[in-house]
Amino acid sequence: MKTRFLFLPVLLFLFAQCAKEKKVEVLHVPLAEFDTLTINSVFDVYLIQGDSNYITLEGNPKILEKVRAEVSDNTLNVYNDYDGKWLHPGNNRIKLTIMTNGLTRINSGETSNIQTLNTLTGNEIGIVMTSKLNQATLDINCNSFYFWNNFPCGGKLTLRGNTHELKIWSVALMAVDAQALVADIATLENKSKGDITANVTQYVHYLIGGTGNIHLWGNPPEVIDTGSDGDGTLIQH
């Protein structure tokens, strides 16, 4: 019995600590104008096209204290400097909701999940991924959209909406699903092990340099191979 009572305070302390770890705080921070978002740490990112610029941070209070959101040279850089973020990754995720009135580029430099909550609009919008694993789902309506990634970046990019020109350069283990994005013209270069799926109505210039395929929808009258030498194939639907 003494042993049981001896452990009880310890259990209560651990329970209190766990409850504290799971506490969620929300911070709302106005921002100066920016057109580029650079993600330098692991986050769940939700993007909103709006008429102002702000960031809302949601997560464990002790981790939020170590999150920095800084605007410099029209770029919003977001960092998480918390030392213990890899100890309990499920409890240490930070949710960012970012409103912008003119986003033109997203740089994902760390493993992140990026989603739009409404449609991003503009003349040109792009996303660049340079970390090992990324997931992004974007609704867009713009004149031109581009995507490229670096080794060893893998993951999946899903695109929906409309654009006049679509430009994709995919390498490593990346997959791009743009079937729900209607484009007039496209440049598609696939050197990845993953596939590219696109929906293009006028013409496509493509190159396959890896094992991944290009699935083409939209029945464009002009489809030009610019020098494919990979094992993947063009599959027209």
Predicted regions and their residues:
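Bacterial Sec-dependent N-terminal signal peptides
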Residues: M1-V29
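Small/flexible residues
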Residues: R4-L6, K95, L207
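Generic hydrophobic alpha-helical membrane-segment signal
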Residues: F5-P9, V29, I98, R160, ...
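Acidic (Asp/Glu) and glycine-rich low-complexity loops/linkers
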Residues: C18-S131, T137-P152, K156-S170, D184, ...
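Short, surface-exposed interaction patches in beta-rich subdomains
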Residues: G154-H237
